[in-house]
């Protein structure tokens, strides 16, 4: 499962959210458009392209056309998992994250990827697969669905005490 917010990944997002602490993000990204697709929709697109004569020798972007600013996406994370965000100066953000190995690529990821508006025209793949944009899971629904699944699958160690408490409560 991937949970991304600008250049941050799930390990940082969840650790901070569960601790009740904010994540720090670059102010420069707050109004930049991003496109994120739920993996289930991408797999449906793939399945409809395999052995599809209309897909031969073609290149496709497998994505939704739904897009939001990173600021809007941050609000989804707040609504779904309680994640708080503080927006700060970009150079200060990069200083906090570090720019030496293994993080030496963060500046480039931010400046040459995440700070560019990413709005996808998926009309070609929709036309070839016969799918409609309305069939896609919305970003907020996808994040919520995956967050709920993650919580169900999280392993917190042996959980012996929790199991004994559960057994006691069932008596």
Language model features by range: what are they?
Residues 1-14, 32:
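Flexible, glycine-rich beta-alpha linker
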Residues 15-37:
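A conserved pocket-lining segment of Rossmann-fold NAD(P)-dependent short-chain dehydrogenase/reductase
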Residues 36, 67, 119-120, 136:
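Short aromatic/basic micro-patch
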Residues 35-42, 138:
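A conserved structural motif in NAD(P)-dependent oxidoreductases
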Residues 45-109, 122, 144-171:
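Mid/C-terminal beta-alpha module of Rossmann-like enzyme folds, strongest
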């Amino acid at each position: 499962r991937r949970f991304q917010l600008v250049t941050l990944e799930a390990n940082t997002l969840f650790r901070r959210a569960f601790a009740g602490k904010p994540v720090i993000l670059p102010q420069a990204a707050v109004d930049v458009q991003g496109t994120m697709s739920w993996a289930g929709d991408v797999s449906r697109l793939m399945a409809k392209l395999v052995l599809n004569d209309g897909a031969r020798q073609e290149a496709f972007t497998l994505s939704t056309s739904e897009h939001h600013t990173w600021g809007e996406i941050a609000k989804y994370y707040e609504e779904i998992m309680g994640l708080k965000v503080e927006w700060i100066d970009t150079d200060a953000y990069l200083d906090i994250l570090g720019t030496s190995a293994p993080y030496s690529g963060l500046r480039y990821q931010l400046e040459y990827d995440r700070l560019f508006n990413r709005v996808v025209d998926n009309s070609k793949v929709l036309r070839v697969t016969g799918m409609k944009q309305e069939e896609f899971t919305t970003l907020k629904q996808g994040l919520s669905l995956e967050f709920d699944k993650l919580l169900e699958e999280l392993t917190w160690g042996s959980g012996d005490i929790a199991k004994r408490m559960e057994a006691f409560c069932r008596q």
